[in-house]
């Protein structure tokens, strides 16, 4: 398969709809997330990944599952998994 697997650490925007004290707001940070997936594409704006795939029996084409599009500005690190 031509796709390479990566461990990607990224910051996920986080929201809060309730009231926060000033201290809570000051300490309010995005969540740091980790994903291990195949990189489908990567450019200056986005990295598109998928974690599972299959070949459609009717068409013979690949189909992808557990797909994500991550803005590159949110990515802290990407490391290729051997």
Give short role names for the model-derived ranges.
Residues 2-82:
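Conserved RNA-binding domains used in RNP assembly and mRNA/RNA metabolism
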